[in-house]
Amino acid sequence: DKEMNGGKGDRVFLERIFHKLLLNFTWWVNLKDEGGNNIFGGGFLGMDNIGVFDRSAALPTGGHLEQADGTGWMAMYSLNMLRIACEIAIENPVYQDMASKFFEHFLHIAGAMQAIGGDKLNLWDEDDQFYYDMLHKENGEAELLKVRSMVGLIPLFAVEVLTPELL
């Protein structure tokens, strides 16, 4: 928007959309992080055809699924919100705290993908060099669903470049 308007972006729009996105982000954090460990599952991303089964439905065997793509998407969402908050904070420093909040969310999510809970389970498989969904069975066992699909690539989308003028 800035490039098309002589270096001046639509901050009013950016603030409005930030608050709507904040509501959606909060919904994901509160309702789709089943274990409270910054690993997400059970949400419809509009990409549910990339898994090997319907991940919006309950598992027929019980247990639950922790989704590499849903978690990676939330990491990316955190970085997108960080970027928007930094942009708004240029003129309204109140948003600096929000930028910090989303940076912390990103760090927690990225860390959780490498060490889930006290068992230190990973969505990343070091041998395969790939992310996988993790199936948590009702008996407490957990295993990676080693299917190479888009599921394992989505976490790689969580990248952001912050320029010095935004910091």
Where are these regions (language model features)?
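Well-ordered alpha-helical segments within folded domains of soluble proteins
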Residues: 1, 71-83, 148-159
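Active-site acid/base region of carbohydrate-active enzymes
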Residues: 3-76, 89-140
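Short, solvent-exposed secondary-structure capping/transition elements
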Residues: 2-6, 164-167
